[in-house]
Structure formats: C-alpha cells, structure tokens
Amino acid sequence: IDRGGNVVGLRRGSGKGPKVLIEGHLDTVFPFGTVHGVEERDGFLYAPGIGDDTRALAMLLGLLRALNQNEIKTFGDIVFVATTREEGMGGLGGMKDFLNDNDDIDISLTIDNNDMSVLIFEATSGETYEVNFYGIGGHAFGSFGEMAQPIHAAARAVAKIADFTVPS
C-alpha cells in the first residue's frame, strides 16, 4: 500500500524492456454499504460498481495469474496498481500520487470501460475543482426578489461551462 492508499504489486521482467503500469480503480460511485452481493443471471454477473471499476480489479488479478501460471517472461517490469480516489471529487488522486512517486513508468494502461472491444489511446486529462458560492440567501417566498441568490450564480456558472467548446 503506497502513500495514496493504492495497492501496488510488481512483477519483475528481465530488465531489458519498458516498465509498464496496468491499473484499475478501487472506488465506485456507490456509497459504502450499497453492494450486498453479486447476482448471476444468464451467465452474467450483476452488482453496483461491477463495471466501474470492480471488473478491472478482477482483470488485473486474472492477468497476473495467467502470466505466472503459464510462466510467461516479460522483458520489462509490470506494475499492477489498484488506485484510490478516481471517482467524483477524488480527481484521480490515487493515480496522481502514484505517478508523482514513480517517474520511471514508460507505458500506462488503464482498465476502465464496460466495452472491452474499445481501446482508447492518449485520452485527454481532467481536473476536478470544488467551487463554493456564498451569499445571504433567503427564503423563496419571504425574500423573493430582494437579494441575490447563490444558487442562481451557481446555475449561471454551470450553464456557461456547458457552453465551452472542447478541443478535438
């Protein structure tokens, strides 16, 4: 476990190849205690968070098991990481902590997509911000029209952000 709470495992290669990071995140969008089990129907598994990103953790372990059981040798080291704080206000915190502490990674693969036929190469980055709007506020009935409402300023800001043109 590293300083960011990530679970890290290293499978050594011969030292003659790139150092590869393969990661999936531990957290889900569901609050703790939401998952009470996994249900199987028609050969499929169902549970909150199973596609984002519990499946990736199973894939990390499955890949490691397959490499070891088949005695597959790699040239480069493979670092397996189950990262923290990907969802919501986590802002990819676990991954950022890991990369800040490990600047020797040559290639990074992230498993985080329900459609395994899709491979995304060089995706854009993201930033997470917390913005607070303060004001006097007031009851909608008793103070209607008498003072600025912070919620109105927040709504205007969100509307302007939604109008941004994202580079392609």
Q: Where would I find each of the regions flagged by the language model?
A:
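Acidic/histidine-rich catalytic neighborhood of metal-dependent amide-processing enzymes
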Residues: G49-T124
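Generic secondary-structure signature for well-ordered alpha-helical cores
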Residues: Q69-K73, N100, D104, N132, ...
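Acidic-enriched catalytic cores of C-N bond-cleaving enzymes acting on peptides and small amides
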Residues: F121, S143-S168
